[in-house]
């Protein structure tokens, strides 16, 4: 039980510090948009951290957005060594996990589903108050 709390604290620290590092230190123009870290999962041995990111302003299914998201992941994965080094300076632990970035489609998928629901509701025929009784 104590180990899971430790992993959660480590994941929270990594998420907080990485968010700041990406915002302040990475100046690559290919990042484009606001990169947000939605979740971090640290392995039990703290050797790896799976970092899930979203990029605000990109819709699900758009081919151009998919290519831009892939490019963002490439930039982040190539900068993972630098980010890990900077992370080790900010978080004082014996082991700093290796970073692996993944695109988190949850937010974009939620927006997509919300749009479908709104469209379905608009397409419903309007019922008068007499029809409801």
UniProtKB/Swiss-Prot annotation:
Function: One of several proteins that assist in the late maturation steps of the functional core of the 30S ribosomal subunit. Associates with free 30S ribosomal subunits (but not with 30S subunits that are part of 70S ribosomes or polysomes). Required for efficient processing of 16S rRNA. May interact with the 5'-terminal helix region of 16S rRNA.
Keyword Kinase in record: no
Alphabetical list of Pfam families matching this protein: RBFA
Keywords: Cytoplasm, Ribosome biogenesis
Organism: Acinetobacter baylyi (strain ATCC 33305 / BD413 / ADP1)
Oligomeric form and interacting partners: Monomer. Binds 30S ribosomal subunits, but not 50S ribosomal subunits or 70S ribosomes.
HAMAP family: RbfA (MF_00003)
Membership in a protein family: Belongs to the RbfA family.
Protein name listed in UniProt: Ribosome-binding factor A
């Amino acid at each position: 039980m104590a180990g899971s709390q430790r992993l959660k604290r480590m994941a929270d620290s990594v998420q907080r510090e990485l968010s700041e590092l990406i915002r302040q230190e990475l100046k690559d123009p290919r990042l484009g948009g606001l990169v947000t870290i939605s979740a971090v999962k640290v392995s039990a041995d703290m050797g790896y951290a799976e970092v899930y990111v979203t990029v605000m302003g990109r819709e699900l299914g758009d081919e151009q957005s998919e290519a831009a998201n892939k490019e963002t992941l490439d930039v982040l994965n190539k900068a993972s060594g630098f980010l890990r080094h900077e992370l080790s300076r900010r978080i004082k632990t014996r082991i700093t996990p290796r970073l692996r970035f993944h695109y988190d489609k949850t937010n974009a998928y939620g927006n997509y589903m919300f749009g479908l629901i709104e469209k379905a509701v608009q397409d419903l025929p309007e019922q008068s108050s007499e029809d409801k009784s």
